[in-house]
Regions:
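Conserved, single-site charged/polar hotspot
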Residues: 1-184
């Protein structure tokens, strides 16, 4: 298959879960290709849930692709109830964030003193997050804003580029989807 079952390919769950509808859709689109300005699109990307806005390729992977531009998606919020992972949040301690930065960004900023979104895209997605500590600071940019925190601790999972960061007490940070609020 050309599609994997990870977040790289989104929601594909393997041939074992195919059914009449999915088989018919595959058959109906056999031989159909996607073109942009007469050129075959060789890197068609998608996602199952965008949090309310897509994002420009330059803000995710750093290169400009004319057909991958960010747009607000008002439809998304109207069907959010259909997506079990649309609303999400997690809490992380300063010590956890420090360990993530050490292991995933190969940097030790010391005791974490502050974390904040330092840049938003035109569509309101996070494209830079700054971590400040007693030994310096580190700024994660583009896709790294999302992927940096994933995979080190089971309870930490940034599911999209559309989120907020809220500082709790001196050592607690709340991260949640852009539609939810944090209390605590």
């Amino acid at each position: 298959f050309d599609v994997c079952s990870t977040v790289d390919c989104q929601a594909y769950k393997g041939a074992a879960l195919s059914n009449e509808r999915s088989d018919a859709a595959a058959e109906e689109t056999r031989g159909v290709y996607l073109y942009y300005n007469g050129e075959l699109v060789t890197n068609a990307v998608y996602y199952s849930c965008n949090g309310g806005a897509s994002e420009s390729c330059k803000n995710v992977w750093g290169s400009e692709v004319p057909y991958l531009q960010g747009k607000l998606d008002p439809y998304e919020a109207s069907v959010a109830w259909r997506f079990s992972r649309y609303y999400w949040s997690f809490t992380a301690t300063g010590d956890e964030l420090r360990e993530v930065l050490k292991s995933e960004a190969n940097t030790d900023i010391g005791q974490v003193q502050n974390v904040y979104v330092s840049e938003y895209s035109d569509t309101g997605n996070v494209i830079a997050v700054t971590y400040e500590g007693t030994r310096g600071s580190y700024t994660a940019r583009r896709e790294k804003c999302r992927t940096l925190l994933n995979g080190v601790y089971d309870h930490i999972n940034v599911r999209s580029m559309r989120y907020t960061v809220t500082v709790g007490d001196a050592s607690t940070y709340y991260v949640n989807d852009a539609q939810s609020s944090v209390t605590g």
